[in-house]
UniProtKB/Swiss-Prot annotation:
It is an enzyme of class 1 (oxidoreductase). Keywords: Amino-acid biosynthesis, Aromatic amino acid biosynthesis, NADP, Oxidoreductase. It catalyses: shikimate + NADP(+) = 3-dehydroshikimate + NADPH + H(+). This is Shikimate dehydrogenase (NADP(+)). GO terms for molecular function: NADP binding; shikimate 3-dehydrogenase (NADP+) activity.
Amino acid sequence: MDKYAVFGNPIKHSKSPAIHKQFAISLGEQIDYRAILAPIDNFEKTVSNFFAQGGKGANVTMPFKEQAFAMADELTPLAKIVGAVNTLKKQADGTLLGDNTDGIGFVSDLLANNVSITGKRILIIGAGGAARGVVLPLLDHQPQEVVIVNRTAEKAQNLAKLFAQHGNVSGYGFNNLPENDYALIINSTSSSMNDELPALDQKHITNCEVAYDMFYSLQNTIFMNWVAQYNSKTKLLDGSGMLVGQAAQAYYVWRNKMPAILPVVNALKQGALT
């Protein structure tokens, strides 16, 4: 049976094994997919041992995506630009291919929820790895502009410069963020994980059509509830669909078969994935 795994720290609450189990069942396949705790100071050796023992592919989650990028022998064009890898595949010649499926999973979830991207003004809160992974896939759909806001303005500006040749993208600190009508606001920070709000002024959300929190939750996150408090018409989405979407794209990278996403998202939201 082909072996796969997800590596992270912490990892015990990962839904990836249950998600990939459902993918395999739906496609009539059998795989062995496990969650593996990688020591903070020993990620590369842990992953190398897994592949040396016959592993076919791996997912990589926090905080190891940059290390996975560094250890890949070959990178997809998107992974190369993003500078982070969440999917590793052992190729026929034994080398490791690094890919990043986060952005594709994110955009596929937006489209599945009938969220319009083209011609829209988009605000991304945060300038870390999660934001970095979604900017280019968003720009591929030709929004009016993508604005990145971060506590450290320089980090947002540097991220914007990285993608400037691909579309209209800019970066700001919270204190000088332009008061534009943002149709789609994305919280890419981990604030909801800690039950905290990003430092965004409420004036920026009054005309928001869609608020998306990348944090996966069975209930509305603190960010989603905050937006709803000031704008009851806003469509609220959490990271469930992105989680399943990026996993489906990883499955496709490994096995050249694309699983159906929506049934697994529904099972995840109902707490039925074990």
